[in-house]
Amino acid sequence: MSIEVISSGLQTTVQDLGRIGWRHMGVPESGAADKSSMKLANQLLKKKINSPVLECTLTGPILKFLKPLSFVITGASMESKINNTYIKNNTPYAVKKNDVLSLSNCSTGCRSYIAFSEEIISNSFLDSHSTYLPANLGGINGLPLQEGSIVKTQPNKLSSSSEGNIGIERINSYKNEWKIRVIAGPEFVLLTDESQEVVFSSVYLVSNDTSRMGTKIEGVNLEFHNKHHMLSSPVHTGTIQCPENGLPIILGCDSQTLGGYPRVLQIAEIDYPSIGQLRPNDKISFIKTSIEEASRQLEDIA
């Protein structure tokens, strides 16, 4: 036994970098919603960047350590304490047996990540330990952490030095207003000329209907030249669909692999981590970019 769950938080799941290369079989990628923060947590503990971590949403868990361990918290800043002592994000801490870690609410951002010095023992499916709740895949029995349950850990079989860029620009950079870079999607041309301009000049509001699968946003309704009927087509994390009501939907890491709504925009990969940190009432502005510019910006931080 390693860690006892005293309180589970709103939704705390085991995540890694996800199931890469299975979307053609209808299996979402899943993985951490903010992969930059997840990688950073592992790098700060000098672990492999794909090691499973705990992803905490809006409200974090209360965990009792049943053995000495080290841990670090990254991502959204929740009010965090070891016993009665406040601690900081992005700083590794060592705890003793019976110490209690508690995470409360975050004021900006949506998701925090907890990495441990030992490996979380969890179920693997298609080479990933990520929890996919709609099908109860991966993680700990395919479920969020449950009050009274035990998170088991084991010593690392392999140690690893830090891999890649830790994304310093993202540390503590969460806010309530987001500028998100996008590329015109395959069906962007179906929008009226006015809507093609409005989508880049308007500020959208994140609705309460947001999850790892997708985020509905509110604002100016987009309009199409004509009523359209299209076959279901491939979609991906960051695809922005627009249903008949004209209000866009941002697809997340647990989104379906096919969709029948027009794909008007595609978020640039460099801003995928922002999708995972959106919370209700946040403001979003879309910034138009090109495939070439988005690729260059991604290479600059690689």
Q: Language-model features: where?
A:
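Conserved "landmark" site that anchors the functional core of diverse proteins
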Residues: M1-A302
